[in-house]
C-alpha cells in the first residue's frame, strides 16, 4: 500500500458536516482554564500587556525550513470538504414554506469551506456569482438580481455571503432582495457564510429563518488533530523526524497508522510501538483543539506556529535523554503554557475592536470601505490596522484587503466577546 492510498483511507471521517446546534467546541483542560482565567484577570488589572510583542518576536526564532514544513503541515483539504458537501446536498430537503431551497454552511478562518463550495459548484456546473463591489451593493445590485431570474432550474452557489452586504444604512437592501428572489423562484442554493456575519444577519435580517438548515464542520478535538497532523507528517516520519515536547521529551505527535509496522507504508521507530504498546503523547494537541475552538484552519495555524520553537537551550536535559533513541532529528515543541500566541493590547481598545468587528462581519475589507462603515477617521483606521498587524491578529489578504488571521482569531474572539459584541457560533 503506497503512502497516498494510506492517507486517503485515514482521511475518511475527518471532514464531517453537522447541524450547527450539534457543534460542540472541545473542552479546555481544567488546569488551562484556571491558568487562562488568572492571566486574563491579571492583564485587565495591569491595563497593558506585552504578550503581543513577545509573540511577534518569537515568530522569527527557529523557523523550520520550507521543504520540511511541506512534509509536516496538512495540505489543502477542500476536496474532502467538497465531497462531504456533495453527500449532504443530496440529502437536505427544502427548508419549508417561505424559506430558501437549500442550506447554509458556516465558515471560520482557514477552514477551506469557501474553496470547497467553489470546487463542488465547478464539478456540478453550478454558477458562482462574483462578490459585488461596495458601490454595487450600495446601489442595489439591480443587474445581479435580474440575472438570478435566468436559468432558475440550475442551482446557485454563494461561497461568501458576507461579501453581499455592508454594515451601512444603504448596505442591506441588496441582500434582502437577494433572499426574496431565492425564496420566490425556489432556486436551489448552497450558501457559505462566516459565523460572525451569520449571527449579525440573523439578528438584523432574520436570515436564519429563511435560509436553513445550517451546518458546520464537526469540531476537531485532540484525537482528530492527532489523526490529521499525523497523516500530514508521513513524509517527516519517513525521514526519521520525531515531535517531542521540550520539557519532558514525551511525544507530541504519534506516527500515523499508515507508517506503522506491517502497513507496507514504512517503518515506525517511535518508542512504545516497537513493544506493541500505544505511544504516549502529551496533551499539547488537546490544548490546541480547545484554544482553536475545534476549528481546523485555526488549529493548523497554531501547529505551524508552535513548530518554530526549537532552541536547544530550552530543551530540558531529561527531554534530550528521551530523544537519544530517535533515529533522526527531533522537532522540539514548547509546552503549551510557554507558547506565546498573538494577543491584543489589554484594556478597552474601542477603535481596535470596531475595526476587528467590521472585519469579522464582512470577512475582509480594504481601508477605503472601513472608512465608509466605521465612525473613525482615516488616520485612526490606518493606525489601528498597523497596530493589529503588529500584534499578529490581522493580515493582508491576497487581494490587498485586510482580514483577521487564523492564528489571531481566538484572541480576537475572546476580546470581542469580553466586550459584549454579538459573536459568532465559534
Where are these regions (language model features)?
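Short, amphipathic alpha-helical interaction segments positioned at domain boundaries
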Residues: 408-426
